Amino acid sequence: KNAEFKQQIGEDGKKLKEINTSKSGSTTTFQNDVYAQNLNLDEDGIVNLNGNFKGDKIDFKDNTTLNIAADKNITSSIVSQDDNIGQINIAGSTIISGDIADSLNKIRAIKLNGRNSNSTFANDTYVKDLDLNEKLTLNLDGNLEANNLNFNKDATVNLADGKNMDAKVNTLNNNEGTLNLLGGSTIVKEVGTDTNRLKEITAGKSGDSTFNDKVYAQKTTINGNGDVNFQENL
C-alpha cells in the first residue's frame, strides 16, 4: 500500500536502525528529512525523498525508482544488490556524498533534471546510463564508470582533477554538451560521434590527461600547464 510520512524521521545522532520500504506497486513518500542507518528499497515500488537523507546507505535490493527532490541532499552511500537494477531521478540541485553502487552491481539509470540546476556526485559513480535531461551542471568529484553518459540537452559536466571517466559519451543533438576536465584525467571511451558532436571539451588545466578513443567536438580548448594526449582521431 502507499504510505506518506509528513514529519521528520529520526535526528542526527539518533538515527533509526533501518527503514524498509518500496513494496511492489506501492509509492512511499517522505515529506521531510530522514535519518536512518539503512534505507532498504526492497521491491519494485517508488520512493519519493522530498527531504534530505542522512545515514550509512540507501540499499537497492530490487528495481526500485528513487525520486530525489530539488535542493535535497543524500549524505550516505548508495548500494545495489544486483547489476542493472534501480533508477534514481534527481529533480534539481543535489549533492550525493557517498559512492553510488560499485563496478559489479551498477545502478540501471540515473536521470538528472532541473533546468540550471547544479549537482555534485562527491565520490565514485557506477551506473549503466547517466542521463542529463536539461541544461544543467553535474560535478563529478569521483570516477565515473558507465555504459553511457548521455547529454540529452546542452548540459555541462565537470570532471575533477585525478578522476577518470570510463563511459561512452553521447549527445542527442549536434553541438550540445560541454565536458570540462579540471585536471589530469583519462577518458576511456569514445566522445561524441561524427554526426552528433559535443559543443566543447576543455582540458589541460593541470596534470596529464588522455583520451583513449575517438573524440568528436565542435570545439576543443587546451588551456593551462597540463599535457593532453589523444590516442585516436580528434
Language-model-detected regions and their locations in the chain:
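Short, T/G/N/S-enriched strand-turn elements that build extracellular solenoid repeat scaffolds
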Residues: K1-G13, K17-S22, T27-D42, V47-K61, ...
